[in-house]
Amino acid sequence: MERILLYVHFNKCNHISGHVFYQLEQLKLLFSKIIFISNSSLSNEDKCRLREDLGISDLLERDNRGFDFAAWRDGMNWLGFDTLQNSDSLTLMNDTCFGPLWDLASIYQRFEEDSQVDFWGMTNFRKTRYFEEHLQSYFVTFKKSVLKDKAFREFWSQVEDFADVQDVIDHYETKFTKRFLEAGFRYQALLDTRQEEAGELLHPDFSYYKPLKILEAKLPFLKVKALTGNPFLARYLLEELETSSSYPTSLIREHLFYHFGPDLPCLLQDKYLSQATSNYRADQPVLLHIHVTDFPIFQHYQDKLFSLSSQYQYLVTVAQPEMLKQLQTALAHLGDKVQLVLSQASHAWLAMLDQKEILQDYAYIGHLSTHQLVENQAVFDQAMRSDLINMMVYYADTSIEALEQESAVGLVIPDLPRLVRDGLFESEPPRPRLAAIWQEAGLHKSFDFMTPPSLTRVYGGFVWFKYSALASLFQMKSLESLPSSEQELSDVLEHLLVYLAWDSHYDFKIMPLSSLPSLLDWQRKKAELTEQKEKLSQKNLSQKIRNRLSNLLKKK
């Protein structure tokens, strides 16, 4: 069979994801010719891989004008409609799906043998008050009967370069099926969603809202947005694929991490460190930085902090000359294992950043301090610090092992302190400030700090890290524009760390605080829901009383 594939690619980072290369590797077995149309720039490395590794020599780069439909139009014009008419089928596809999850050859054979079908796709969209019934365009195949008809050329010849994607949806995505039906052709969808129950759906898009149905029906493609748009369901989708499909789910995780962020819910399950190990010897030097703002607190934890093995060197900074003298006396017995520095900066992280010349000689670095973590609550402040320091020390060797053994890991952060998990310490992330600093820093990736329900915070800034993972922070010119208030500065930096590492393609691991069962989270959630219901009930009661009084006054 002479099958042609017009494959449209777009990537805001001008990068071809691993799942796309895998997809093309599987698809090339089915097609006589693949034309790769990119609506974003391609690197020379990616072009070389397409040509040499996959044998795809037909590459068409264009601006993202008119989106997928204009790209397919340009692909047809570039190939020529006469060539299309002489082929047995033309498949239009984009890179918005993972797959193939299951065998695709048998599906082609089934539809090619069915004389009652002229064009077909994976899923259709039922008629609504807003849209006509239509095949979803992420995968559509036209047979020769359609390709030879003048209606096919007429439709594609009038496709415009719309600047608004909604115009593309309104004019082409939702209209092409009806256009070819009116021309006398017949279509089928591998999953005919018209026959499926959709009463509870806000929008009858099964590829997005019903991904479990997609897997149950063994459709070979799963939309990327089915995972990003259903963040707490995504983990179960991955588990189902690992059980029922041979598709390498690592490609999904890599794509989600690279393009959508390091802390999607479906990625968190793999971030806990393994059981704590002891006496791991790193091949490269390790440094623990401690910034001392309160000498009695430092004394309280001194024995624990300096109980680490001989591979650990220490850098202790302090901003007060009198406290420096106290530290010199307290640490004199440790000799050259400890470097003591009088810092010009009082904030713990600024004090560390000032020591760039020392830190860059170490592959792995830890950071903690004695600064106040919870304002005006001494008991809470002590409880949080205790949790954080205990994790930093207990998991020190395991953290260094993860940093050294896993090239992709750049940070190891503490789990949520008990105080946070109990709902007794909450603070809203400084989202506008984070977004502004990110923009000013001119980083590689874009990240939306405004939309996610939560952002990952490194409490206290306590962390083990690779210098290379946070090199951008040490070089960041916009540090001068950071808040002057120490608490505001902490809020910003603690919310930036995992995203700065992610921008440099580093992931993070979590030191578990396992003393709290997950049942506690469920109990807290139920308590919050109950509280919300009570507030709503009180609000409704107050409104009823006001309405009643208003009616009584009117009667007078």
Feature-to-residue mapping (PLM):
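ER/Golgi luminal nucleotide-sugar-dependent glycosyltransferases, focusing on the catalytic module
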Residues: M1-K556
